[in-house]
Amino acid sequence: MKAVCPGSFDPITLGHLDIITRAAAQFEEVTVLVTANPNKNSGLFTVEERMDLIRRSTAHLSNVKVDTWATLLVDYTTAHGIGALVKGLRSSLDYEYELPMAQMNRRLSGVDTFFLLTDEKYGYVSSTLCKEVARYGGDVSGLLPEVVVDAVKQKYTQQ
């Protein structure tokens, strides 16, 4: 079965990478799908930059590919014959947020959502928090893939 790991990934964190790696061990093919979230600002990285950082961070996973999509997620899964969505859950708050979307996606297309519990060492990690720490010169190594740490530092030194 093919699966999608959707998200804005601005930027990809080690928590995201852990979920993607675990999904890749369970599914024959995993597409990391960079989506535009209308509830979030335009972002630190462009969609193309995010896709490049994800490709570089997942290069060791032969069954992972990266794509982007700007409309309904279920339209992507239907168009590409994908039967599963994979989402990471850090806490019950994530579950409360993700459950109605999972139910709507199932209603619209029959796609199932698989929830993977985040490794406890990444339970507090979010792209937003990492950007906030990095913006003020804090150390985000151990929270982001190394290639992403370098890219984030470069972005903030340019501003």
From Swiss-Prot:
Reversibly transfers an adenylyl group from ATP to 4'-phosphopantetheine, yielding dephospho-CoA (dPCoA) and pyrophosphate. The record marks 16 as: Transition state stabilizer. This is Phosphopantetheine adenylyltransferase. One of its GO terms (molecular function) is pantetheine-phosphate adenylyltransferase activity. Belongs to the bacterial CoaD family. Homohexamer. The gene is coaD. It catalyses: (R)-4'-phosphopantetheine + ATP + H(+) = 3'-dephospho-CoA + diphosphate. GO terms for cellular component: cytoplasm. It is an enzyme of class 2 (transferase). It is found in: Cytoplasm. Its main location: cytoplasm. Gene3D superfamilies: HUPs (3.40.50.620). NCBIfam families: coaD_prev_kdtB, cyt_tran_rel. Pathway: Cofactor biosynthesis; coenzyme A biosynthesis; CoA from (R)-pantothenate: step 4/5. One of its GO terms (biological process) is coenzyme A biosynthetic process. Keywords: ATP-binding, Coenzyme A biosynthesis, Cytoplasm, Magnesium, Nucleotide-binding, Nucleotidyltransferase, Transferase.
